[in-house]
Amino acid sequence: MNYPSNPNPSSTDFTEFFKFDDFDDTFEKIMEEIGREDHSSSPTLSWSSSEKLVAAEITSPLQTSLATSPMSFEIGDKDEIKKRKRHKEDPIIHVFKTKSSIDEKVALDDGYKWRKYGKKPITGSPFPRHYHKCSSPDCNVKKKIERDTNNPDYILTTYEGRHNHPSPSVVYCDSDDFDLNSLNNWSFQTANTYSFSHSAPY
DNA sequence: CGGTTTTGACCCGCGC
DNA sequence: GCGCGGGTCAAAACCG
């Protein structure tokens, strides 16, 4: 499969910054790294046009599978994460940005099975937001899909929560005795953008 | 027939 | 409190 290249490539590698459980430090470092002083009012990681902290622009929807996999790490809106922790919710939130020239249906197909359960108009945006829930039993991962108001060429996909099961269509490992719980290290590279890695007791 | 989408109604947290 | 906006429910429609 051939995906278009990122129109705004960056060679920045945040690998060393991403450690579980020290999100605040991580966030500060990223902001320093991309030279963004005023991050408190507009927490955008890599694209200033959005009010959301975007984990990465992706060119392959399958990349989001790993990010919401059972061993994913936290990145997302700082206040939102704190709020979710207060409410004892899984704090994981990812926002991915996809060029809409990629077929929207392809962007939706991230390897997991989803059930759409809502659609709402958003104030200040001419585009509605779509609500989806993972169809796997007892899995509470949700995702929201909306067009970036400031940049309608892009679609923002927000993931919340960690899947309690591997992706039905993505192979993580071809080992026979593969065990999710014993997989403590993983990494993935987004095409032409950032690479993430994770090592945590999961 | 089983699962998904559609859609308006409902719910609820938050700011005033 | 109360109202607004965002999030969810659920019944009916839809679809392979």
Curated annotation (Swiss-Prot):
UniProt entry tagged with the keyword Transmembrane helix: no
DNA-binding residues: 103-168
Stored InterPro entries: WRKY_dom, WRKY_dom_sf, WRKY_plant
Classification via PROSITE patterns: WRKY
Pfam families: WRKY
Main localization category: nucleus
Keyword annotations of the record: DNA-binding, Nucleus, Transcription, Transcription regulation
Subcellular location: Nucleus
GO cellular component terms, semicolon-separated: nucleus
GO MF annotation terms: DNA-binding transcription factor activity; sequence-specific DNA binding
Span of the signal peptide: none
Keyword Nucleus: yes
Family indicated by similarity: Belongs to the WRKY group II-c family.
Function, in words: Transcription factor. Interacts specifically with the W box (5'-(T)TGAC[CT]-3'), a frequently occurring elicitor-responsive cis-acting element.
Protein's name in the database: Probable WRKY transcription factor 59
Originating organism: Arabidopsis thaliana
